[in-house]
Amino acid sequence: MNPAAPTATLPSTQQRRLALILFNVCVGQFIVGLDQRALLVALPTLTQTFNTSLTTIQWVLLIYDLLLIGTVITVGRLGDLFGRRRFYASGFLIFVLSSALCGIAQTAAQIILFRGLQAIGGAMISANGRAIASVAFPASQRGKAMGFASMAFHVGFLTGPTLGGFLIDTIGWRWIFFINLPIGIWGAYLALRLLEESKEEVKGVSVDFPGAILLMLTCSLFIFAMNEMPHVGWRDPLVSGTLILSALALALFVFVELRSAMPILSFSLFRIRLFTASMFSLFFITSTQSAISFLMPFYLQDVLRFSPTQMGWIIIANSAVIVLVAPIAGWLSDRMGSRLLCTIGSAIIVIGQFFIASLPIDASIWRIIAPLLLIGLGWAIFNSPNQSAILGSVPRDEVGTASGMNTTTARTGGAMGVALSATLFTYGLSAAGMSRAQIESPQSWGDAPEIFVHSFNHTVHVVNFFTILSVLFSVVRGPRREIRQR
């Protein structure tokens, strides 16, 4: 990876400065991707270590997503107002502290709690890192810079499963968190040493903390209801009451946002057709990606009996393609816009997920890897152009907010995808005759592989419908001329 590549046509002094900025942003994207992907490989191991259920262990992922949803736009706005460098460097330090705490956790509840703290650090890195790169680079090279940032994230994705699997098999799962410490400390040092402060000179503004809390509450209540629904039905007072509370929280959130001087969601941005369609495309595509990423390790370990190391090598297939293709897609988006690229990319993902939904109980390794390669190719073609469209379609002083909204949308889609897949998968197991005790004991799923695979296939077919919606939103997003460079 050569971070200097996007700066080749600029004067040498500016090239060097932008290369250093991009390199530091890439470090931040790398550590977030590394941690996220390594943890996926560890989910079956954590379930066994803490003797807990799928319903509980999914909160190791969900708490991170929900806290990101509630904080990423806020810290993006705070970075816009008070200094992106300050919040970016602080994000690294929080990420390091929380990773250390996760590594020494003794219960599932502790690791869930510390993952919440880790989410705050991840939000500060994600929102402010991409905003720093977007503001620093000229409009003509923003897409390529975003492509390199995306590539760095997926280098972390690529490294995470293999490194995580190796660490789990050799020295234990705790080291998937401890490995973050030297990288995070290095990232904080580089941010403080290399970056200049970047903020917008705007006076008399406030940060929308009520909006952040209400958005997080809306999603949390809805996901909790979805988790309980397979066990007690939607008519149960707990489920129906929680859904009503979620709807009320959503209504209150909209009410607060429309009256806020500095809303967490700038509804005015949704008047921009390109921005809106790109956001919806991102939401639907991340919901399906997260659903499959959540269930796939259990299929590989509990049905096919792969070790964590073997799982890691299989799961990296799509990330390997992304690392190679993402910069090219970003370069193409600078020249031809996002509509065609995002449409093609999301359509390829639909095809790959269809084959994932057709996997048998005795699938060969190549039958698994081939659709993962297709999904990786589609995501690489889709993601960089989509991010460039989102950040390039808004005013300069809204870039941090748009970056936060980008991450929030992806995480909301991801959280909904995990919750929906767990709900559908649990329904499938229950309909096939599994008791609640069996359903909540993933260690027993391997004893009934036919039931597992049938439910897994059905779940993936259903969630693949959301990727089809992403294709449609990519088609209607509008031509490149709608991008508003400020």
Where are these regions (language model features)?
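Intrinsic disorder in cytosolic terminal tails and internal cytosolic loops
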Residues: 1-17, 201, 444-447, 477-486
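Transmembrane-helix bundle of Major Facilitator Superfamily
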Residues: 2-193, 325-329, 336, 340, ...
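Flexible interhelical linker loops that connect adjacent transmembrane helices
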Residues: 12, 188-216, 258-273, 334, ...
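12-transmembrane solute porter fold
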Residues: 20-27, 34, 39-41, 210, ...
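Small-residue (Gly/Pro/Ala) motifs that create kinks and tight helix-helix packing interfaces
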Residues: 43, 156-168, 222, 297, ...
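Hydrophobic alpha-helical interface/terminus motif in multipass membrane transporters
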Residues: 43-46, 132-133, 167, 195, ...
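A membrane-interface helix-boundary motif in multi-pass transporters
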Residues: 169-181, 228-239, 307, 426-464
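C-terminal membrane-cytosol helix-exit motif in multi-pass small-molecule transporters
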Residues: 181-200, 216-228, 245-260, 470-480
